[in-house]
């Protein structure tokens, strides 16, 4: 099959499956009917049925990645619209994100250390709550397995976006700041997309949470590894 035709088919497959997954969730509101999860499972099923390799899919998937990278710029709009509220809560935002990052590190590091896992495994898992573009680089530079890091980043994002709404209701969080920072800090881009579905203010704070988590983590992870290894 011509490469251009295959690329176009893979793009169409992705868009169509995501569209129907989104419609399914709208018709049957359920956090487990997450469009990203359903579409991903659908793509995997189609690739297995037709014997299409990952590289074959990425002939079209890489174009989608380029488009998604450009759409990140759109996150500037909710930030700009809520700039005054952001300015008024700078200390709360920073303290909340830093606390979230440290708790994540403690959970991952101490658990893996207790079970005797090696430095490579720890480095691979530590960036799981960072957005992929940064997390992959952090893992790669410190000797982790970046392909596995991607898997854990995606899994973390999906779990956060699926269970986040239930946990927020359970904790009775009503503030857009709290909801947004929780999503951005715990489940990066997946969480930010979910926060934007709630309201633009939550989306703005989720964007900040995602960015700050990536920056703080990329600084602290190397420090943690140097201290203990």
Swiss-Prot record:
Compartment(s) where it occurs, according to its Swiss-Prot or TrEMBL record: Cell membrane
Membrane topology note: Multi-pass membrane protein
Pfam families (UniProt xref): LrgB
GO CC terms: plasma membrane
InterPro entries hit by this protein: CidB/LrgB (IPR007300)
One of the GO BP terms on file: killing of cells of another organism
Record key words, sorted: Cell membrane, Cytolysis, Membrane, Transmembrane, Transmembrane helix
TM region(s), chain numbering: 4-21, 30-52, 62-80, 89-111, 147-169, 204-226
Origin superkingdom: Bacteria
Protein's job: Increases the activity of extracellular murein hydrolases possibly by mediating their export via hole formation. Inhibited by the antiholin-like proteins LrgAB. In an unstressed cell, the LrgAB products probably inhibit the function of the CidAB proteins. When a cell is stressed by the addition of antibiotics or by other factors in the environment, the CidAB proteins possibly oligomerize within the bacterial cell membrane, creating lesions that disrupt the proton motive force, which in turn results in loss of cell viability.
UniProt family annotation: Belongs to the CidB/LrgB family. CidB subfamily.
PANTHER family in alphabetical order: HOLIN-LIKE PROTEIN CIDB, PUTATIVE SEROTONIN TRANSPORTER
Name of the protein in question: Holin-like protein CidB
Protein source organism: Staphylococcus aureus (strain MRSA252)
């Amino acid at each position: 099959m011509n490469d251009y035709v295959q690329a176009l088919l893979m793009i169409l497959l992705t868009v169509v499956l995501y569209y129907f997954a989104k419609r399914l969730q709208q018709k049957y509101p359920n956090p487990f009917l997450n469009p990203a999860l359903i579409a991903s499972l659908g793509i995997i099923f189609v690739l297995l049925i037709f014997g299409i390799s990952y590289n074959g899919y990425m002939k079209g998937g890489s174009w989608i990645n380029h488009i998604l990278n450009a759409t990140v710029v759109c996150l500037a709009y909710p930030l700009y619209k809520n700039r005054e509220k952001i300015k008024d809560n700078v200390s709360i935002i920073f303290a909340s994100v830093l606390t979230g990052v440290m708790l994540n590190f403690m959970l991952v590091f101490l658990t893996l250390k207790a079970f005797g896992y090696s430095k490579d495994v720890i480095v691979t898992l530590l960036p799981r709550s960072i957005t992929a573009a940064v997390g992959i680089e952090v893992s790669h530079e410190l000797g982790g397995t970046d392909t596995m890091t991607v898997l854990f980043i995606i899994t973390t994002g999906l779990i956060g976006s699926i269970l986040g709404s239930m946990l927020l209701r359970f904790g009775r969080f009503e503030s857009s700041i709290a909801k947004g920072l929780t999503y951005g800090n715990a489940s990066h881009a997946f969480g930010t997309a979910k926060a934007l579905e709630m309201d633009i203010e939550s989306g703005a704070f989720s964007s900040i949470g995602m960015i700050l988590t990536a920056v703080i983590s990329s600084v602290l992870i190397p420090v943690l590894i140097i201290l203990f290894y």
